[in-house]
Amino acid sequence: MSSPYFCNHLCVVSVCNMPPNKKKGKGKKEPKKGAKKPAVRKPLTLKQKQRKESKVVRADSLNWKPVEIPDNLESYEGLYGIEELDGVDVKYVDGKAEFVVKEEKKDTKKEENENEDKNEIEDEDDEEEFTGFDDPVTETKRPSDEPDLKSKKKQKPNKDDELRENAFVGVDASLPKDTDLPKWSMENVSLSTYTINGLAGCGFKEPTAIQRKAIPLALQGKDVIGKATTGSGKTLAYGIPILERCLAQLESKTNTIKPPTAMIFAPTRELAHQVVDHMNKIAKFSPLAQNGIVSITGGLSIQKQERLLSHGPSILVATPGRCLELMEKSVDLVNRMALTDMIVLDEADRLLQDGHFEEFEKILDMLNKHRPKKTQGVSRRWQTLVFSATFSRDLFGKLSNNKPRNKESSFIENDEILSLLNTKLQFRDRTPAVIDANPKEIVSGKVTEALVECGPSERDLYLYYFLLMYPGSTLVFANAIDSVKRLVPFLTNLNIPTFSIHSSMIQKQRLRALERFKAAGEKNQTAVLIASDVAARGLDIPNIDHVAHYHLPRSADVYVHRSGRTARAGKEGVSVMFCSPQEASGPFRKLRKLVADSANKGSRMNMHSDVKLLPIEMDLVTQLKPRVNISSKLANSTISTVSTKKSDSWMKEAAEELGVDMEEEFVDDHLRKQRLRDDNKILTKDQAASLRAELKSLLNERLRINKRRSYLTSGVDNLAHQMLTGDSHEAVWGHAKVKALDQLKKGKSTKKSK
């Protein structure tokens, strides 16, 4: 059998007996008989090629590179001075190690291309020299003027190089007509035209209290600690100084990757993405590149984030976990981040809370170690900006804890804020500027707080009553993810558009839910977002009319941030709590003591002195009970079916991995009881179809207040008058359209009407 090399490279040509004059081309002399045929050269094998291209090198002449030890690994348990090699093979000959290095190939392609170009030019010259015919004389362009395709290809700019130069490009962005915002002209501060146009485009005609006080100090390079109620514009209070610093550092193009001008840290992914959106809106008219502001958060592709960081963005917005993960993978990235000018802590109390976000403390340590001590143009420490709505120690305590509270006020002075932060941070200034825009408020004065007293099993009923009577955009907070998952099908069955967001969802699902909820709010449609406390901090969702606390929050600071999701940007809103009698006697009373105004300090406060009871129409509540009961059964059946399928699949996978047969005898008693409870809640297809049909008929019936009325014109606010004027409630006959905020402001009787 022939070798495969011979099969591939040898070609046998048979020539038929044809006359010589009919053969194509010139005839070739046939080799004489008995002459030796030329030997066919066999191709080199892979091993032969490697031997030819490699050489043995002594160990001391190799290109050893020192290994940089990451900070998180400390000192490799005592090892130091480690070096590494790349592209070296080790061969053992007679027990001795030999280092084999590949020889560098000579780059002959360039020489070939140059020779080809020379030959082409010579051919062109030869053609031009021929002047045998008298053609009309025309002006001809010089060869240098003609476009050279090859040179064009060589001069084609690289996209990565353009992005790597700087986050800012040296061209002026197209600006709209001159805009004048005189109220943004603060003392000793003149904002750039780019920023002014960005503010005008977003509709911010005047600064808020925290912005008016913090921006001038931040632009002067001072450390700032800002405290203000939720929804007061803290993002722009540090965002505008950062953008102005970036514009001031605008330089010519360079090939080096520049360090970020500012690093902004946020406790949640959603808050980080929101900060990026706000910064991009303000920087819309500035010469900021497409990837000038980058978010570094978990739940998204880490490879894409590494690529964006390689282009040297000017502003980084990060969550501590993903930022630390990227820093541990690259020492070059740490060195670049350590040269930043500004570090911002948004929702700083959460970032620095004991037992939380240990990653952030590690990040600060790594940046401190790698920041150069004496470098021209780099100060010893970076500028630090700290912002939050809550800084009190008492606000973080659990409301269910019965330990005696400090007799001092829950409001803390500036000195105490400094002592709290100095233990965690190292400021550049000895005395950072502390700004308290709302010293006597924790919850914004634009938020009207309300209470609904109900039993633990009646939360669903009263929540549905509230959503039905007061349509609009509502954000419902629950303490448990299971409650979030159950409320979504419960309200969906009642024809209420409902979305959900919780920590078990992947990042893309969270962002999609937020986008849909925002879109519904922008169209003034009724929509509900059921959320865990992952959405409590920092999220700026426009046009939220109500915040409903399905469960009382576990700590006072969570209540403050939950309530701050409404009444933003100067608007008003409602925060309503659904409270059981057990909660009212303990956690609710403690919550009110912590959050109440300082005017009540030291006085014996009535539980309802600053929280109004929401008026309840008990006649309507009774009519809603059948709907709620059916919807609860359908929702429980859906949740139990999903839970049962998940547990079954998990048990099967575990049994297959162990190689055992899954039998009922080996199932744990607790799992068996849980399965029995779930099976009891699961409805058959016929039962579910019957209940859905019954619920549909109930939903098609419009509620009627005070059913004993027999005539359309009976009562002061009669039904006929409301139908003619169009003031009738969409879901309830005989009930006027009313908003929860207006209802609470009227100061109606707090007793439930019967």
UniProtKB/Swiss-Prot annotation:
Q: EC annotation?
A: 3.6.4.13
User: Which segments show compositional bias classed as Basic and acidic residues?
Assistant: 103-118, 138-150
Assigned keywords, A-Z = ATP-binding, Helicase, Hydrolase, Nucleotide-binding, Nucleus, Ribosome biogenesis, RNA-binding, rRNA processing
Q: Where is the Helicase C-terminal domain?
A: 460-619
- In Swiss-Prot or TrEMBL terms, this protein is called ATP-dependent RNA helicase MAK5
Name its cellular compartments.
Answer: Nucleus, Nucleolus
Q: Which residues make up the binding site for ATP?
A: A228, T229, T230, G231, S232, G233, K234, T235
Q: Where is the Helicase ATP-binding domain?
A: 215-409
Broad class of the protein's primary localization: nucleus
Bias (Basic residues): 21-40
Residues spanned by motif Q motif: 184-212
Please verify whether the record's keywords include S-adenosyl-L-methionine.
no
InterPro entries in UniProt: DEAD/DEAH_box_helicase_dom, DEAD_box_RNA_helicase, Helicase_ATP-bd, Helicase_C-like, P-loop_NTPase, RNA-helicase_DEAD-box_CS, RNA_helicase_DEAD_Q_motif
Domain remarks in the entry? The Q motif is unique to and characteristic of the DEAD box family of RNA helicases and controls ATP binding and hydrolysis.
For this record, the Gene Ontology CC terms, alphabetical, are: cytosol; nucleolus
On whether Hydrolase is a keyword of this UniProt record, the answer is: yes
Motif DEAD box positions after renumbering to this chain = 346-349
Quick one: where's region Disordered?
17-61, 103-168
Give the encoding gene's name.
Answer: MAK5
The organism's taxonomy opens as: Eukaryota, Fungi, Dikarya, Ascomycota, Saccharomycotina
| Reactions this protein catalyses | ATP + H2O = ADP + phosphate + H(+)
Free-text function comment from the UniProt entry: ATP-binding RNA helicase involved in the biogenesis of 60S ribosomal subunits and is required for the normal formation of 25S and 5.8S rRNAs.
A single Gene Ontology biological process assigned to it is: rRNA processing
Query: What family is this protein classified in?
Result: Belongs to the DEAD box helicase family. DDX24/MAK5 subfamily.
Among the GO molecular function terms of this UniProt record, one is: ATP binding
Q: Where is the composition biased (Acidic residues)?
A: 119-132
Q: Name one Pfam family in it.
A: Helicase_C
